[in-house]
Design a protein with these regions (language model features):
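N-terminal secretory signal peptides that target proteins for export/translocation
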Residues: 1-27
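Terminal accessory/anchoring regions of large secretory-pathway or extracellular enzymes
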Residues: 54-59, 316-490
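Short, well-ordered beta-strand segments enriched in hydrophobic/aromatic residues
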Residues: 78-83, 196-204, 365, 407-409
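Bacterial N-terminal signal peptides
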Residues: 31-46
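Extended, loop-rich substrate-binding clefts of extracytoplasmic carbohydrate-active enzymes
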Residues: 55-66, 71, 134-193, 221-226, ...
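A contiguous, surface-exposed recognition patch within enzymatic or periplasmic domains that forms
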Residues: 72, 79-81, 89-93, 205-213, ...
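Acidic-aromatic substrate-binding/catalytic surfaces of carbohydrate-active enzymes
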Residues: 75-151, 307-338, 350
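Acidic, contiguous internal or C-terminal segments within carbohydrate-active enzymes
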Residues: 85-86, 94-96, 173-224, 371-373
């Protein structure tokens, strides 16, 4: 535990934004690095050794070959992460149980194409990466795109930061002269849960102040699990809708068909339903999370990062979805030619979930970090929302019966451990708890349990307590139906 805390403090101090004139901040940073280097890294002044699988309290870091690429694998009993530094520092795959979340371009498997600085072609390998925002070609304050850019396609340096109890690597990218930025990203897991942590740093390496947003771009595989030549008809992207949205209808269709029936706002959520109509849609979601839901397999990925309500986001967008598929725009008829037609390319099915940071002005040498977390879990297309301990399909319900208090609901949990029911009376006083079953992120939680609750119980909540005994928060909360009788004699005569 001391190692994990020291590692976190070192990372925060080392990469937090400081002014070059702040001598005290630099001194604190240097002192913390000296004190913690042996604790965090296992040796003074060096990174953890590579070249072998190293385990520590339930997680491993190892070199591997992934689909023909030299990769680094982070793994625990729930997840495997395949990181390919050569491909612009991409996280190429996240496997949860036996389910692969991310899209991989089969035509480029095992290949590497250096940045095309002449024709500016973009090579889409798939996976997950960091890009700058805003995009555009109108001035130097917009990014013209990934084609030929070092930050997207040049090799990144990889360093193993720790082998346990936190398994962490750092990816350091090249300087990108187009935007004057350098990206540095830490990716880590522990042995305690399937949660994945990201610490993405953008650093101004130019000689003048610059303002940018950094964006996590994750390509999720939207092909049918039964036939990869077909799209998955039960595939969704979900994020909280903004009730005071700056966009008409609560979202902005940037590319594609503006009347795409796959876009909807209902019950406080913006949803993208995959329907083979490609396009990009922007939202100004204030919720701080985005979920990608595969209703066919009941696997869901929840991404979280802190939303800053007073900050400026690129063109007001906080969460963006992009889907491949037909653009549904008329084009010219095919030319009549005697030349044989090229064989059609295989279909490409993926959904991008793009998470934006605020727009940040950085002086030369300054840096900014966006922290985010991924939580793989189980949930189908009944998905209705997220808490800090899980996702909800059917909300919690509590029914008083002669046999006891019956709790029901459908959830996906983010942490392994135990479910604990908390009981409250009409006055909101805590009057007891009871175990309500096990929490397993790899299994859908179909809650159906009868508990012996105190007779005055008027409200109940169900929390997830992890294997370390830490309360991760409620899955849901509900009033008991029918409610218990009101106590007599209170307030002059009962209610």
């Amino acid at each position: 535990m001391q190692e994990a805390k020291c590692f976190q403090k070192t990372r925060q101090l080392f990469e937090s934004p400081i002014r070059t004139s702040d001598k005290r901040a630099r001194a604190r940073r240097a002192g913390t690095l000296i004190v913690c280097s042996c604790v965090v890294l296992g040796m003074c002044g060096a990174f953890a050794p590579r070249g072998r699988a190293a385990s520590g309290k339930g997680c491993t870091v190892s070199e591997t070959n992934f689909d023909g690429w030299k990769a680094e694998q982070l793994a625990n009993q729930w997840v495997k992460l395949e990181i390919v530094p050569q491909l612009g520092g991409r996280l190429m795959q996240v496997t949860f149980g036996d389910h692969d979340f991310l899209y991989i371009n089969n035509q480029l498997k095992g290949q590497y194409m250096p940045p095309d600085t002449e024709q500016h072609r973009w090579f889409n390998y798939g996976g997950d990466k960091i890009w700058p925002m805003p995009e555009g070609s109108q001035d130097e304050q917009h990014w013209a795109g990934a084609g030929g850019e070092p930050l997207d396609d040049a090799p990144y340096d990889l360093q193993v930061l720790s082998h346990g109890p936190t398994c962490a690597v750092r990816l350091t990218g090249p300087v990108d002269p187009q935007i004057g930025q350098q990206y540095i990203r830490d990716i880590s897991i522990t042995g305690e849960s399937p949660a994945i942590s990201f610490h993405a740093v953008m650093k101004n390496v130019s000689g003048y102040p610059q303002t940018w947003s950094e964006q996590s771009v994750s390509q999720y595989n939207a092909a049918s699990p039964n036939d990869p030549t077909q799209f998955n008809p039960d595939f969704w992207g979900v994020t909280p809708a903004n009730p005071q949205s700056s966009y008409l209808n609560g979202y902005h269709v940037r590319t594609g068909n503006p009347t795409n029936s796959g876009y909807s706002v209902k019950d406080g959520l913006f949803r993208v339903h995959w329907n083979n109509m490609g396009g990009e849609v922007w939202t100004d979601s204030p919720g701080g999370w985005v979920a990608v839901v595969d209703g066919t397999t009941s696997y869901t990925m929840l991404e979280r990062r802190k939303f800053e309500p007073t900050a400026e986001y690129p063109d007001k967008s906080t969460i963006i979805f992009f889907t491949t598929g037909a653009r549904n725009r008329p084009g010219p008829p095919p030319a009549q030619t005697a030349q044989p037609a090229e064989p059609p390319r295989p279909p490409t099915y993926y959904m991008e979930a793009e998470v934006n940071s605020p727009m940040i002005e950085l002086a030369p040498g300054e840096s900014y970090a966006m922290d985010s977390q991924w939580y793989p879990t189980r949930m189908d297309s009944s998905f209705q929302g997220a808490t800090y301990s899980g996702v909800t399909g059917t909300p919690l319900a509590a029914a008083a019966t002669p046999n006891g208090l019956v709790l029901t609901g459908n959830f996906g949990v983010l942490y392994p451990g135990q479910l604990i029911a908390h009981f409250y009376n009409r006055g909101g006083e805590a009057i007891g708890t009871a175990p309500a079953g096990d929490a397993n992120p790899l299994q859908p939680l179909k809650l159906q349990i009868t508990l012996q609750a105190p007779p005055e119980t008027a409200r109940v909540s169900v929390h997830v307590v992890d294997t370390q005994g830490l309360d991760r928060g409620p899955l849901g909360e509900a009033f008991v139906n029918p409610p218990p009788p009101a106590p007599e004699g209170r307030g002059g005569g009962g209610q």
